[in-house]
Amino acid sequence: MSEHLIVKNKKAYFNYEIIQTYQAGIVLNGPEIKSIRNHDVSINEAFVLIRKKEIYILNMNVKKYQFANYIKGLEETRTRKLLLHKKEIIKILNKIKQENLTIIPVKLYFKNDYVKLEIALAKGKKLHDKRQTIKKRDTERKELKNYK
């Protein structure tokens, strides 16, 4: 099983405390997959919604593939369906309702020639938690610099 990372959402790790991750497939068109292979995709502003026991990703920006004739009405930031088992969707729904969590996209990657999206159940960090993260990172950098 070979995994090839395409995009990682670095802001997600800074702004949220990640509790649990899930691997989901995405429903895509042919030209979109070509664009993703060229790394012409962004998940920084993307978010995940659950509607009628189905999971969708919104605002995932997949640029138009330059060599493809595009279908009318196909937008770069259209709503795309995520593929998960029903049991996983029900688990996610229950955890969101009980613990007041959100679902965020963490990374996009290829796994055996299929595009997969790693989504995470996360809790938003407060401002003071973010400051502590920055202080911790700075001290680790200083220690590493002094070590060299």
From Swiss-Prot:
GO molecular function: RNA binding
Record-linked Pfam families: SmpB
InterPro entries in alphabetical order: SmpB (IPR023620), SsrA-bd_prot (IPR000037), SsrA-bd_prot_CS (IPR020081)
Keywords on record: Cytoplasm, RNA-binding
Swiss-Prot/TrEMBL GO biological process terms: trans-translation
Taxonomic source organism: Mycoplasma mycoides subsp. mycoides SC (strain CCUG 32753 / NCTC 10114 / PG1)
Keyword Protein biosynthesis: no
Function field: Required for rescue of stalled ribosomes mediated by trans-translation. Binds to transfer-messenger RNA (tmRNA), required for stable association of tmRNA with ribosomes. tmRNA and SmpB together mimic tRNA shape, replacing the anticodon stem-loop with SmpB. tmRNA is encoded by the ssrA gene; the 2 termini fold to resemble tRNA(Ala) and it encodes a 'tag peptide', a short internal open reading frame. During trans-translation Ala-aminoacylated tmRNA acts like a tRNA, entering the A-site of stalled ribosomes, displacing the stalled mRNA.
Family: Belongs to the SmpB family.
Residue intervals passing through the bilayer: none
Biological classification of the source: Bacteria, Bacillati, Mycoplasmatota, Mollicutes, Mycoplasmataceae
Name listed for the protein in its UniProt record: SsrA-binding protein
Subcellular location: Cytoplasm
